[in-house]
C-alpha cells in the first residue's frame, strides 16, 4: 500500500488550474524530497496532503492517503504530522506565553492554547515527557515561546506532532530562518526522526535534502516534472529546467548543494 497515491489530480483557483494532472506515489519508509521553485505548486500540493483543499472532480482521479480517499482531518493528523512555517507563526503570535511542555501538550487537541475544558490524563503528560526526551529538548519544558529561538520553537512544534506517533512527517522548508549551526542541528534531528517515520520534505533548498532521502519529486509550473532516484534527478540539467537557472550541483558525503550559478 502506498502512503501517498495520487493519479490525475488537478487543483484550480478561480477556474484556473494551479496543479495539473498530478501523479505521485510515495511508499511507506520512502523518504522523499519535493523540490521546486517558489510558485511551482509545492504549497498547494502540501494542502492536498493535509486535506485543507480538494481537487477538481475527475472520474479518473485517485487521491489516497494511507489507502483511504476520505479522511476526517482530525484523524489524518494522527497519522500524518505536518510542520509548516504558518504553525510557527501562529504560535509566536497567538500564544507567546506557552512553554515548551504546553506547546507539545496542545497537540492532543490540535489547539494553539491549553484551555480549562481540555482534559489531559497522566498518559498524555507521560507521552509529552517521552517526546521531549526523544528530541533532546527537555530543557525547553518551562521555557516560554517568547524566549525561544526560531529553532527551539520549531523543535517544540515537531514534538507537538509526535505525541500522536504519526506514521509520517511532512516538513515544509524546515530550516527557514535558522542560522548555519541551527540548520545543521535541525537536520540531524530530522534524520533521527527518519529512523522511525517516513519523512516528506517540501523545499526549494537543495541543502535540506539529507542523506536518508532516496527519492526526489521535481515540480515545475504546477506539474510533476520528474520523480525518481535523487542521484538521477539532482543534476545540473534537471535543476536548471526546474529552477530556470544555470545551476551547477555538487555532492559531498551524500549531501547536495549548489556549487555555482552561471554557464
Regions from the language model: what does each represent?
Residues 163-167:
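A short, proline-enriched helix->beta-strand linker immediately N-terminal to the Walker B motif
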Residues 169-173:
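Catalytic Walker B motif of ABC-type/P-loop ATPase nucleotide-binding domains
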Residues 236-263:
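ABC ATPase nucleotide-binding domains
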Residues 105, 120-140:
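Conserved ABC ATPase "signature" region
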Amino acid at each position: 500500500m502506498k502512503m501517498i497515491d495520487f493519479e490525475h489530480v488537478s487543483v484550480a483557483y478561480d477556474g484556473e488550474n494551479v496543479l495539473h494532472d498530478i501523479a505521485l506515489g510515495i511508499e511507506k519508509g520512502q523518504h522523499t524530497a519535493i523540490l521546486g521553485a517558489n510558485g511551482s505548486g509545492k504549497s498547494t500540493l502540501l494542502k492536498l496532503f493535509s486535506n485543507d483543499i480538494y481537487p477538481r472532480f475527475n472520474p479518473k482521479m485517485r487521491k489516497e492517503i494511507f489507502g483511504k480517499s476520505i479522511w476526517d482531518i482530525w484523524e489524518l493528523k494522527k497519522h500524518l504530522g505536518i510542520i509548516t512555517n504558518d504553525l510557527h507563526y501562529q504560535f509566536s503570535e497567538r500564544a507567546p506565553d506557552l512553554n515548551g511542555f504546553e506547546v507539545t501538550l496542545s497537540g492532543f487537541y490540535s489547539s494553539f492554547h491549553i484551555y480549562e475544558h481540555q482534559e489531559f490524563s497522566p498518559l498524555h503528560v507521560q507521552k509529552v515527557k517521552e517526546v521531549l526526551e526523544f528530541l533532546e529538548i527537555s530543557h525547553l519544558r518551562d521555557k516560554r515561546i517568547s524566549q525561544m529561538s526560531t529553532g527551539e520553537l520549531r523543535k517544540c512544534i515537531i514534538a507537538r506532532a509526535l505525541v500522536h506517533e504519526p506514521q509520517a512527517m511532512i516538513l515544509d522548508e524546515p530550516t527557514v530562518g535558522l542560522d548555519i549551526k541551527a540548520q545543521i542541528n535541525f537536520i540531524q534531528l530530522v534524520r533521527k526522526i527518519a529512523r522511525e517515520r517516513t519523512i516528506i520534505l517540501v523545499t526549494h533548498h537543495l541543502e535540506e535534502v539529507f542523506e536518508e532521502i532516496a527519492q526526489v519529486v521535481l515540480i515545475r509550473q504546477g506539474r510533476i516534472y520528474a520523480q525518481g532516484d535523487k542521484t538521477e534527478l539532482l543534476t545540473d540539467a534537471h535543476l536548471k529546467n526546474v529552477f530556470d537557472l544555470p545551476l551547477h550541483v555538487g555532492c559531498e558525503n551524500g549531501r547536495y548543494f549548489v556549487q555555482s550559478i552561471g554557464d
